[in-house]
Each structure stands twice: as C-alpha cells, then as structure tokens.
C-alpha cells in the first residue's frame, strides 16, 4: 500500500512547537508562524471531537435499527459504482448518515488522526476527504484517502501496526514540484557561495588594514568596523542555519510517514522542558538579528561619515569616531534587547525564528529607517558629485566622459550605501508569488550575500594607498630574501667607503689573492670625497658670497591628504577649519 510522505516545511513547522497555556487569535501577519499553525490544528481537533459525538450517536441508532449503512456522495446523490483499486475524491466530509440501504455491514468509525477528521466509512469503500485548509503548506485542491475493509475496520499497512492513509495529493504541492525545489536549491547555493566569499575577502581586508600602520586612520577604522559587521552577519547566518536545522535535513523530513507526523502533532512538550531545549536556537537567532542590525547601521555610519566630510566645515574625526562606534554597535543592541524582552514575555514559543504578530516591527522599523536615511544621504552625495564634475569640466565639450565618471561614482557608492535594499523594500516577499517572487528572491540573495565581497574589493583591494603599501612591503621582503640568499651562497658586496651596494656580486676591494683584472671602464669612477661636503668649491670656481650654508634643509611636510594617504588625517588643527584636501582620498576612491 501507499505510504504518506510529509513535506519538509510541514515537518519543520510541527517539529518545534510549544503550546502556550492560553491561545491567542491568529495574527493578521504576513508570516504564518508555528504557533498559529498549532492553534489551528487544535481548534480543528476540538471541532472534530464535537462532530464525532454526534455522528457516533447517529450511527449507533442506525445499527440498532438494522438498516445497515450505505455511503452517500457529497452532493446527496447516489454514488456510482467504482472500479476496484481506484481513488475517488469527494469535495467534503460526510456529515449525515443516510437511511437508504444498498449494502449492509458495520461501518468504519470516524476518528481524528491529528491531521484530518475522518468521517464514517462504508465497508469496502475508499473514503476521500479534502486536504485540510488549516494546514498552511498543504495542497488544498487535493484529497486524502483511507480504505474501510468489509469488516468495518480501517485498513492497516501490512507488517505495521498503523492505519493506512494516502496523503500524496496533499503533499504534491511541496514534494512533487521539482521546479520549485530547484529554485530553493539554487537560492541556497547563491547565498552560501556569496556569504562564504564575502567572509573570506573581508577577513583578508581587515588583516591588511590592521597590519599596515600607515593605513591607521579614522576613515579606515570605520571601514574596518563595517567589514567586521559584514563578517559577523555572514558567520551568524551559517551558525543559525546549523543550529536550527542540525537535527533535521530535507531528505529526512520527506521520509517521515503519516504515523510519525501524528506523533509529532499529538502532545507538545512541557513549557519548562521546551525552554531548555530552545535555549541554543534562541541565542543563535538573537545574535543573528543583532549582527544583521549592526551591519545595516555601520553602512549608515559610512554614509554619515562621508556626508559629514562634505557638508561640515568643522569636523573632528577622532571625537566623531567614538560616537560612530557607539551608534553602530550600541543602538542595535538597544532595540534587539527590547525585542528579546517582549518576545520572552509575550511570545516565548519556539525558536524565535519566525515573527510573532506585530512584535517584529521592534526590529524592522529601525532597520527600515536606516535604509531610508542612507538612501537620502546617497542622493545628496550624488548631487554634490554631479556639481563637482560640472565645475571641473566647465568649458569642455566632452559631456560623455562627464556622464561616465558620474555613473562610475554612483556604482561605487551603491554597495557602500546599500542602495539595493530600497528596490523591494515596500514589497514584502510574502505578498508576491510566481515569477515576481523568484526575481525578488534571486535579487536579494545575490546582492545581500555578495555585498561584503564587493565592498572589500572596492574599498580595500582596489584602493591605491593599500596597493602602494603592499608593493612596498613586497619589495622590502624580496630584497631581504635576496640578501639572505646571497649571504648563504658566499657572495659578498663591494663597498664605496662607508656605503654598501647590494646589487654587486663582485668583490672589488684590494684583497690579496682575490683581485681580478678588470677593464678601467668597469671599475667605479674615482670620486673626490671633499666635493660632497657642504661649502666645497672646485678649484677655479667663483666664490660664494654667503659661505654659511645650513646643514639641514627645510622640506615641505606631506600633509597626508594627497594620494589617499592616511598620515595626517587624524591631526587636527586647533580652532582651524578642516583643510580642503581632506576629501582627496575619498574623491579618489569614488571618482
């Protein structure tokens, strides 16, 4: 006989429920929660128990009157004879017991199997009931089937002490849709690859910025905080998935039989035991929400910092850095803590991984506010960039180059400001379906998971200052390695007085037994050491009026604002306005 297979989403739905002492009404929410599903199941059970009492009482009277039992169709018309071995669906349950008799015998008694309320079954007939609409993930156009044998008992699975039932049509919506399964597999692969690449690239970027001391400045400190928030967001997603779905794979869920589903749905665990069992997953979900919020707020900090550099005449970077740090890490902790308190007090059920009514807005409203504010800052900065480009190219005829620069600057700022969040911000994914839903999910999974990778590439690996430091470090390392290699091979270096050259492998010094006959053109030119001293004049040269020449020379100090250098960025001029070259490194990155 057939064996019912339960879909993954329903198994996960019923695997972690905790029934509270007092049921609340099902929230008019955009997400169907586990608690709401359990409430509907128990309400259906209560209605079924009431109906069973009435039907059993009527059936007992019929059997006592020796009128027997005959099945009736859902429309009240006589049912046609059916070919054996075929399933014939009915649109609703039989609620009235007919008095007409074509076939005598004891009927199969109605019962509640923790999923469906089964009606009386006629001997030798297949009973079909619609897939219940109170189970959210069922295919509500299908039917579930049972067979009543000629002895008045529900047919059992051979070799198993359980009732046979066929829920295949109810589960067809989830298990037999290969195309939908491929979509979910593809989405999972996209965000797994994206977050893995982001985590790896951001780790390298943070190590680079932390290793080179010349890169230590306010601008790069803020970059490092944002990189760290992306890393923690990716890591928390992987941890959350591992904790929530560690004991339940999709293949295992699909192998669950109808009997196992009944056991899952029967009695929820006690609240005390459930609280201990859910502690790990609740902590994982809480940290995931916190790091998600901090990531949004550090993206906002980047926008506020760049906006402040442009529009604030007096800007103390060191003082603002502390404020930005508290804002980026502290403010999300406040509203996440409020959400945890409300959830633990009013909706302390399950793993907290699904929304519970309108309590989700405690976290979503601050995040949406940061996205909107950052988008406003983005528009204002793009306006300033366009104005700067027009002023720079005033009097020139090549406007296409101007537009290309503006487009490039805009694309560079898009991942930094998280502009892609605004595309579907006003369209919740639960309100769309079909092709639009697939487009939205692929778009969000792609950009959200790869955003950290794009940010690391643009603001670290493609940064001219970072590349210069890496090249200098590489040159020093190769020179030191070359010097050690030559020292081990026995080579020595020739010297010109106190100076040593590391580029020669020939000993030119007057050492006995080791001198080589060299051409005069290959020998170093003889130099007069006095000619290198200050105040020395060649014989016959005109005398210098001022014979006092300073030993030290004044060299203009590099303020550090040019060429993207960090040196000097954090040196404030007391009481003076911010120097104009302060934006040079930002413009070079953006332009």
From Swiss-Prot:
Subcellular localization, as worded in the UniProt entry: Cell membrane
* Bias (Basic and acidic residues) ranges: 81-96
InterPro entries the record matches: GPCR_2 (IPR050332), GPCR_2-like_7TM (IPR017981), GPCR_2_extracell_dom_sf (IPR036445), GPCR_2_extracellular_dom (IPR001879), GPCR_2_parathyroid_rcpt (IPR002170), GPCR_2_secretin-like (IPR000832), GPCR_2_secretin-like_CS (IPR017983)
Q: Name one GO biological process term.
A: cell population proliferation
Q: By its UniProt entry, which Pfam families does this protein fall under?
A: 7tm_2, HRM
* Sites where a glycan is attached: 151, 161, 166, 176
Q: Give the UniProt entry's GO cellular component terms.
A: cytosol; nucleolus; plasma membrane
Region ranges (Disordered): 67-104
Which key words tag this protein in UniProt?
A: Cell membrane, Disulfide bond, G-protein coupled receptor, Glycoprotein, Membrane, Receptor, Signal, Transducer, Transmembrane, Transmembrane helix
GO MF, one example? protein homodimerization activity
Tell me which parts of the chain lie in the Cytoplasmic compartment.
Answer: 213-219, 307-320, 383-409, 464-591
Q: What residue stretch is flagged as signal peptide?
A: 1-26
Q: Which residues lie on this side of the membrane: Extracellular?
A: 27-188, 240-282, 343-361, 429-440
Tissues with expression: Detected in kidney.
Function (record text): G-protein-coupled receptor for parathyroid hormone (PTH) and for parathyroid hormone-related peptide (PTHLH). Ligand binding causes a conformation change that triggers signaling via guanine nucleotide-binding proteins (G proteins) and modulates the activity of downstream effectors, such as adenylate cyclase (cAMP). PTH1R is coupled to G(s) G alpha proteins and mediates activation of adenylate cyclase activity. PTHLH dissociates from PTH1R more rapidly than PTH; as consequence, the cAMP response induced by PTHLH decays faster than the response induced by PTH.
Return the similarity comment: Belongs to the G-protein coupled receptor 2 family.
Q: Quote the subunit structure annotation.
A: Homodimer in the absence of bound ligand. Peptide hormone binding leads to dissociation of the homodimer.
Spell out the protein name for this chain: Parathyroid hormone/parathyroid hormone-related peptide receptor
* Organism the protein comes from: Mus musculus
